[in-house]
Structure formats: C-alpha cells, structure tokens
Amino acid sequence: MAATEDERPTGSGEGERLDFLRDRHVRFFQRCLQVLPERYSSLETSRLTIAFFALSGLDMLDSLDVVNKDDIIEWIYSLQVLPTEDRSNLNRCGFRGSSYLGIPFNPSKNPGTAHPYDSGHIAMTYTGLSCLVILGDDLSRVNKEACLAGLRALQLEDGSFCAVPEGSENDMRFVYCASCICYMLNNWSGMDMKKAINYIRRSMSYDNGLAQGAGLESHGGSTFCGIASLCLMGKLEEVFSEKELNRIKRWCIMRQQNGYHGRPNKPVDTCYSFWVGATLKLLKIFQYTNFEKNRNYILSTQDRLVGGFAKWPDSHPDALHAYFGICGLSLMEESGICKVHPALNVSTRTSERLRDLHQSWKTKDSKQCSENVHIST
C-alpha cells in the first residue's frame, strides 16, 4: 500500500526534496479558528488578524469547506463599528479586532452603539474585509461610507496612517492596510492618494530598499507594503523611474540566502519568502531567484507533527508564519496550493471574486443613475 501524505519519509538534507504536508496544515488552521494556546492571549484585541491567517490559509489550500462560513461571517459583521444614529462617531468607524469591549452582539443589522473607547483599527478593517470576501460575502452589510470616513480620519499630514483615532505608530504597514481597504471597497476617497504616494517615495533609503518612513532603515516588510500599495493604486511606474526600480529589484534579490531575510545581516525567516518574494513577483523578476533553496528552507520550518510553519527550523509554528510560508510556496507554484495575488495577499480566486463584485457594483450604480435621470426628466 502506498504511503499516505503524512507517512512518507523525508530528509532534511539540502539535496533531498522535502514533502509539503497539506492535510496537516489544513488541520492546523482549523485549530486556529477553534482554540488557541495560552501564549496567544495577548493578541485578543487582534483576533481578527488570526482569523485572516487561518481563513486565507484554508482558502490557499482549497479547504474552506471545513469551516462554517455563515457563522464566521456573522461574527465578523458583529465587529463592525457602525455609525450611531446621530453619526457623531463617523471618524471612528471600521472594524474592531474582537468583542473585548463587551458591546452587544450586532451583526451589522442595527445602528452602532456609542461607547467612548470603541473604534475601528486600520489593520482589523483590512483583515475583516479580506475575510468577508474570502468567505464569499458580497459586502452588502459593510457601511462603505463610514469605513472610508474612518479611514480618512487616520491619515496624517505626511501621508502616512495611524491605526486608531487616538493615535498610534504611523508607518508603511498602515499605508498598505489603507490601500487594501480602498482597493477592496473600489473607492479611493478614503485617502489623499498624492500624500500617500509622497510618503512611500520619501521612504526610499540610501541602499534603495523602502523603510517604514523617511530616514529609517530599509526592510523587506516595508518594501513589500510600499510596492504593493503602489501596484494596487496603479501608480508604480509613475512614482519610480526605471533606474530606481532596477535598484529596488537589486536590493530585494540580494535578500535571498536560502530563504529570505528582511534586512542585511539578519537571519533568514519564513515570512520573508512572501514579503520579499511577492515584491520580486510584482517587480517581475521572481523567476531569477533560487526556487529550490527557498522551498527547502520553508519546508525545513514545517512542523511535521501538528502542522503549520515556524519562522526558523525547530521553532514553534504560529498562524502568521504558517500562512506566509504557504503563500511563499504558492509563489513557486507548489502543488496543492492555490495561486496567491501578490499585491492583495489573498488567493487569485478571491481577487477574481472581488473583481466580479466591483463589476456588479458598477452595473448597479449605472442602473440607479439611469433611473434617477429618467425620473428627473
């Protein structure tokens, strides 16, 4: 009898081909949606991001059928910060990370409840919208106007974004979140695009990578966030010249050892196989990297017992590295994994569903506009 996927022997040597244990990763993501280790308790206010890693991971593995989509959709909508009846909290709207405030369960079917400490978080709005699209929702209960108003309130004068209205760190991560939100809602009125573009451009460092902000150290994660944001805006080649793009390409391609690191002289880490790999894909030079070494590194961090991936070999797996490890393998067209949309960070199937959704909105708006013209005449 042939060995099953989980029983096949494998080696860890550089020259041996390691197995991708798909079924174990499916079970790992299932557990992330059901019960989490105690060490995750500090992430309670960011629970929606963990849900994103698990749901998008299952989507990448074509295994969303193992979850109750309707229940999760209702839970996500219950995290939407809606306008109150007097609309006094528009600048605080979006999605919160979990039900930590104890506000009554409301899956976006009634007006919002006023609470002095309740507000959306830019990363939770990004992951919340992503999860809804991944699960096949049509976003009909998303208050788009309020989400965009809340997003506009988070942009600072230098073009960057903070996470919450009370103020927080402001850097390239949140510029990317804002770009994804506008792209998914098909409405760029949520930001001053010119200011955001200037912020990205000013973040280019002396060594040609992109930093979290002007004058800071280049980083693989912030380079992805900046380049992906410009791609979502459709502005990449307007912002950087061909010469500058070639320099960015060189900086990125120099990040590979076997896997990728995020900064010079730092250890290789599984997640950068996506952050840097996706940037190289967007810059159209990923094909010049060493796929075999990258694949072997990612799979060396795979937990063969419980599933998932860690940042380093012989470390504990976690939801973030499990997801980005799979996305990194997807860039190399690993068997059993769906294709990833490198800028939006979801499966291409989900990005195509989103495109169809945008088209349906456009058709609906055109029809409504025609009806209004007919009534007025």
Curated annotation (Swiss-Prot):
Q: Which InterPro entries match?
A: GGTase_I_beta, PGGT1B-like, Prenyltrans, Terpenoid_cyclase/PrenylTrfase
Query: Can you quote a single GO CC term?
Result: CAAX-protein geranylgeranyltransferase complex
The intrachain disulfides are none
Q: What SUPFAM superfamilies has UniProt attached to this entry? A: Terpenoid cyclases/Protein prenyltransferases (SSF48239)
- Looking at the keywords, is Magnesium present? yes
Q: What's the protein name?
A: Geranylgeranyl transferase type-1 subunit beta
Q: Which organism is it from?
A: Bos taurus (Bovine)
* CDD domains with a match to the protein in the record: GGTase-I
What stretch or stretches form a coiled coil here? none
Q: Which reaction does it catalyse?
A: geranylgeranyl diphosphate + L-cysteinyl-[protein] = S-geranylgeranyl-L-cysteinyl-[protein] + diphosphate
How the cofactor is bound: the record states: Binds 1 zinc ion per subunit.
Gene Ontology MF annotations:
CAAX-protein geranylgeranyltransferase activity; protein geranylgeranyltransferase activity; zinc ion binding
